[in-house]
């Protein structure tokens, strides 16, 4: 393989630029030319494709976002869009593609491979909801951003004897909420993977007041409901105290990537080039127990929920390589809470 391309697709994540940099420089070291595709699959179909050099990725490793830009392009789910994209790639002499993004991006990469065009996926999403990897590019930075915000919210919460409901991102996964909540010492964490009762949340807050605690931080993952809806439900369940809502929003996607995300992205980017060099496509690179692994890309595009309740009321672990259930129980133990 003499020429490959790299694109970013879907929601941006800190560390994407570090991954692009690794792809470019590893490929050059292997004697492979690299082209960048602007705006994801939309740019592929439009032919917005250009050569990248080592200088093109200079000083990019610490930048948030993606300098190749990103976009959602549902038209690529159709065969016509896929074939149009492949036609453009062939015009530029490109023989393989590295796709950095989430599960929607992975589906596009799989379609390319099915049409005989090798594609390798890298998990770029703050949600950490990709099966086949312990961590995704951008997750660590997002958690750090949320923890920093929670520390600041705690300052004002304690000054006014208030309870704050803080809504965080994660789509249908509770990874950000769990990890940031543990790190920031949140009093309660609500995630979409497990059911809970608002009455129990109110009781736990009241128990805190009885023990002399004058403020509380409640984390709610966006996959549960909005922060405003959650606050309303708390009031309906009997909460009488001063209650405020903070929605952290898109600051969770921005910012300079942490050292961990930079290293992870660099390792994954280099591995993607090695796979394409060897003619391997249709796989996604992940990390498990600190070792790089590859998985069939179609399987990794499934929902990455950590765990869920069974019909009998037990807990089913959907991805044993993630520590979600352990963290949920840890938070309950640290705050003397009931599991539900």
Curated annotation (Swiss-Prot):
Q: Where is the active site?
A: 127
Which enzyme class? transferase
Q: Does the keyword Transmembrane apply?
A: no
What Pfam families does the record tag this protein with? PFK
EC number(s) per UniProt? 2.7.1.11
Q: Which SUPFAM superfamilies match?
A: Phosphofructokinase
Task: Explain the activity's dependence on pH.
Answer: Optimum pH is 7.2-7.8.
Keywords for this protein: Allosteric enzyme, ATP-binding, Cytoplasm, Glycolysis, Kinase, Magnesium, Metal-binding, Nucleotide-binding, Transferase
Task: Write down the superkingdom of origin.
Answer: Bacteria
Q: State the Gene Ontology terms under molecular function.
A: 6-phosphofructokinase activity; AMP binding; ATP binding; fructose-6-phosphate binding; identical protein binding; mannan binding; metal ion binding; monosaccharide binding
- Give compartment(s): Cytoplasm
Pathway per its UniProt entry is: Carbohydrate degradation; glycolysis; D-glyceraldehyde 3-phosphate and glycerone phosphate from D-glucose: step 3/4
> Could you give the subunit structure recorded for this chain?
Homotetramer.
- What's the protein here called? ATP-dependent 6-phosphofructokinase
Say which species the protein is native to: Lactococcus lactis subsp. lactis (Streptococcus lactis)
């Amino acid at each position: 393989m003499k020429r490959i391309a790299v694109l970013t697709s879907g929601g941006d994540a800190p560390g994407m630029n570090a991954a692009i940099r690794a792809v470019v420089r590893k490929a050059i070291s292997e004697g492979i030319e690299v082209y960048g595709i602007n705006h994801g699959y939309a740019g592929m179909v439009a032919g917005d494709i250009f050569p990248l050099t080592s200088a093109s990725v200079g000083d990019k490793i610490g930048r948030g976002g993606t300098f190749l830009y990103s976009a959602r392009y549902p038209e690529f789910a159709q065969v016509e869009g896929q074939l149009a994209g492949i036609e453009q790639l062939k015009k530029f002499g490109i023989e393989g593609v590295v796709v950095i993004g989430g599960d929607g991006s992975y589906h596009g990469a799989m379609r390319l491979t099915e049409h005989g065009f090798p594609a390798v996926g890298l998990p770029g999403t703050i949600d950490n909801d990709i099966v086949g990897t312990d961590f995704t590019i951008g997750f660590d930075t997002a958690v750090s951003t949320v923890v920093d915000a929670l520390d600041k919210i705690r300052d004002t919460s304690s000054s006014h004897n208030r309870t704050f409901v803080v809504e965080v991102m994660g789509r249908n996964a509770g990874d950000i909420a769990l990890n940031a909540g543990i790190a920031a010492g949140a009093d309660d964490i609500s995630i979409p993977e497990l059911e809970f009762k608002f009455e129990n949340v109110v009781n736990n807050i009241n128990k805190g007041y009885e023990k002399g605690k004058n403020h509380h931080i409640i984390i709610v993952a966006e996959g549960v409901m909005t922060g405003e809806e959650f606050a309303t439900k708390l009031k309906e369940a009997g909460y009488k105290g001063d209650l405020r809502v903070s929605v952290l929003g898109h600051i969770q996607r921005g910012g300079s990537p942490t050292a961990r995300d930079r290293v992870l992205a660099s390792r994954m980017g280099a591995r993607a080039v090695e796979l394409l060099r060897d003619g391997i496509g249709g796989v996604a690179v992940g990390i498990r127990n600190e070792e790089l692994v590859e998985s069939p890309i179609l399987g990794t595009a499934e929902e990455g929920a950590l765990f869920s309740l069974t019909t009998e009321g037990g807990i089913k672990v959907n991805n044993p390589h993630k520590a979600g259930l352990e963290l949920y129980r840890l938070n309950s133990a640290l705050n003397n809470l009931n599991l539900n």
